Curated annotation (Swiss-Prot):
Belongs to the peptidase C48 family. Keywords: Cytoplasm, Hydrolase, Phosphoprotein, Protease, Thiol protease. Residues 257-420 are annotated as: Disordered. This is NEDD8-specific protease 1. The keyword Calcium does not apply. It comes from Schizosaccharomyces pombe (strain 972 / ATCC 24843) (Fission yeast). Disulfide bonds: none annotated. GO terms for cellular component: cytoplasm.
Length: 420
């Protein structure tokens, strides 16, 4: 556990200085940063829609790790996890790739899995995706154990990050948007889970979360345990539930949706999701701030480097169509040319339903330098507080039990019908 002083105690969240700093770019979100967003959603948004809110469970990162990696039975898990778990319809699970690294060292990437319990469907959102779902499969298998049903997992197309540190910010943005939709839609359709056209401005979201933290400390103090007052300015300090989140003016790349899904069965769990199809040439305007982020990566922690290769469209007009220089004779009167409807250039408006023709670069496996990525040694997250408990063989502080056997290697966790 970090020895830095506590900046804020907000319900069950204990903010250290590094957690405060993690909200600002170019830093990775800590697990506490994600806890903070979940607490704000539960205390500022849920009271407005109590019936729908009762169906949603935002599972904290430390509990997701417990769910995925603890060598305990489903019955023991039910005791350690929130009582609401077995009655919820929609389970949000922020996934950290902690199992790739030594215990206590921290993971290097955040992604999001949401389980729709009645449908037996899991949706996976990854802002640094290659179309695979390896990081979430342990959690998926344990969810299947808990609810005694098989779940199909679908890798969803989402905005791809353009730097090495915004994965946690994207997870929070995806969570905010999906919760907002669920609260407004008591009977969600499959299209509600589609975030392919959702282009959040994660920089603006980071700034708003920092401002909200400052407002809480300045107006309520450094210890907040009771509910927020009804006059708390949620819409201006946090995010207005009735409005959209901050969005980008210029669209960033979206990973194409995988054409097949994987069930928690032997056949499907041993096969990767289909690789995303490669897109054609691209012609889009890059966000200036995103370009600066790419140059910052050499000076900060990051998990992967992506080099986006952008090609420019060729001139659409053929040589025969190009306008020739014309020098009129003295007797020739120059007429202004008004193009006919057939000559008018049609504006190209990207359509969410016509992704193949959009001028958006689509990230595919062939555009990634896999050998270079494999050689990169991920730098641990600045603070993943659950790791200190793990190193000591203790459960996270959120649990009452301290007697449960805790960790085994991930490959030994899954048995029976769910080999991964």
């Amino acid at each position: 556990m970090s020895s830095s002083p506590t900046v804020l105690e907000l319900f069950d969240v204990c903010f250290k200085q590094e957690d405060v700093d993690s909200l600002k770019k170019p830093n990775w979100f800590t697990d506490v940063s994600i806890d903070y967003v979940d607490e704000l959603i539960e205390h500022l948004w849920f009271p407005s829609y109590p019936n729908q809110a009762n169906e949603i469970l935002l599972l904290r990162p430390s509990l997701v790790f417990l769910l995925a990696e603890a060598a305990i039975s489903p019955e023991e898990l039910k005791v350690a996890l929130p009582k609401k778990l077995m009655n919820c319809k929609y389970l949000f699970m922020p996934i950290n790739d902690l199992d790739k690294h030594a215990a206590g060292s921290g993971g290097s990437h955040w992604s999001l899995m949401v389980a729709s319990i009645p449908d037996g469907q899991c949706y996976y959102y990854d802002s640094l995706s290659n179309g695979k779902t390896k990081d979430c499969r342990s959690a998926l298998a344990r969810v299947s154990d808990l609810f005694k049903k098989k779940f199909t997992i679908e890798c969803m197309p989402v905005q791809q990050q353009r730097n090495g540190y915004d994965c946690g910010a994207h997870v929070c943005a995806f969570t905010l948007e999906l919760v907002r939709r669920l609260l407004h839609s008591p009977m969600p359709t499959s299209s509600m889970w589609n975030l392919s056209t959702f282009q959040p401005d994660v920089t603006a979201i980071r700034e708003q979360l920092s401002r909200c933290l400052d407002h809480i400390i300045n107006s309520l103090g450094t210890r907040v345990s009771g509910d927020f007052d009804e006059d708390f300015p949620t819409g201006t300090v946090f995010f207005d539930l009735e409005s959209h989140l901050p969005l980008l003016d210029v669209a960033l790349p979206v990973l194409p949706k995988s054409s097949d899904s994987s069930e928690t069965s032997h056949e499907s769990s041993n096969s990767n999701l289909k690789k995303s199809s490669e897109s054609g040439s691209t012609n889009h305007h890059n966000n200036h701030e995103s370009d600066k982020d790419l140059h910052h990566e050499g000076h900060h922690h990051h998990h992967h480097h992506h080099h986006h290769h952008h090609s420019h469209d060729d001139d659409p007009s053929s040589p025969a169509e190009k306008k020739q220089n014309h020098v009129p004779s003295p007797s020739e009167k120059i007429q202004d040319h008004v193009p006919s409807p057939s000559e008018k250039k049609q504006d190209r408006v990207p359509s969410p339903s016509n992704n193949k023709e959009d001028h958006l670069p689509l990230l595919s496996d062939e555009k990634l330098d896999k050998s270079a990525i494999d050689k990169i040694e991920p730098t641990p997250l600045p603070s993943v507080h659950m790791n200190s408990h793990i190193a000591k063989g203790e459960l996270p502080k959120f649990h009452n039990s301290t007697d449960n056997p805790f960790l085994t290697p991930p490959e030994e966790l899954v048995s029976g019908d769910f080999p991964f």
